[in-house]
Amino acid sequence: MEKDVMTTSTATTLANVVASPPSGRPIAVVFDHHEYAASVILRGRPVPWDNATAYASFFAQAQGLLRPDVALLDLDRLFGHLTAGNTSLETGMAARSRTGFALRTLLGDEDLNRAVLEFVTVFAKTARQPVVLRIPSPMKWLRGTHHFSGADDTSALDADNAENASMYVSDWLRAFAGLPVAGLLLDNRTSAGASPGVHVPLETYTPIANLAGNYRWTLGQLDDDQARLHGDAAVGAYIPAGFWLGSDVELPAGDFYLGEIPSAASPEGVLARLETLG
């Protein structure tokens, strides 16, 4: 029997989705299907980052196949595409050695912000599921841009630096105030090959928490072991990559699931695994 198509409204929050999954599953699922969808749907063609309407169509195809409870847009990937080869921006980011200057310059670039807002606006207004934006946590973003200051060592960056960075991020997020956003996830997971560094808890980012509260966005943070939501007892568990590859993997306990579907997964295997999620 075909299930009802999910719809979203400005009243929907990620916390609501976790409490009552619109897909009808017993536990809500948040999928990062970018690599898988690029492999299965685009089949080697480039991801249409430069055409928001084409990207929304590509994304909707993947959503229709996988039926997650939200539409997750990773802005770090979008930033990566839009800033690639932008030497003028990089020069500006390297103009001062002060900690956080590079990140502040990145988030203050008018041309970049215009392109990002146009893209997110099309995405948010065409998505058929509640929209959740994912960005690097302020500490992760600070680490990722710190080399522009002339210092490659990020070990001295601390929670105070991260809190200062969160002010730049919260100011930047105001551009999305008028969009139907259900949640904001700060990706604080350690990048492959990187050292963990100091852990900064979600509570440190008061400016972002205040903004999210004002906009009625559910705020969460993805740490290496689990995901948690601000002011909510719900804990998110990660679906292991092996689950999608057909191995006998037991799912961890959690109030909601987050999963990145690998590009090597077969469509038949993925569909079979989706059945086990309800």
Region annotations inferred by a language model:
Residues 83-175:
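Active-site-proximal, glycine-rich beta->alpha crossover segments in alpha/beta enzymes
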Residues 21, 60-67, 121-128, 174-178, ...:
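Acidic (Asp/Glu)-rich catalytic clusters
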Residues 218-278:
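Catalytic-face loop-and-helix region of soluble metabolic enzyme cores
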Residues 40-53, 150-167, 239-245:
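Active-site mouth loops of central-metabolism enzymes
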Residues 109-128, 197-221:
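Alpha-helix-loop-beta-strand connector modules within alpha/beta enzyme cores
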Residues 51, 70-108, 183-197:
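Glycine-rich, proline-tolerant flexible connector loops at the mouths of alpha/beta enzymes
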Residues 166-183, 205-208:
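Alpha/beta enzyme core
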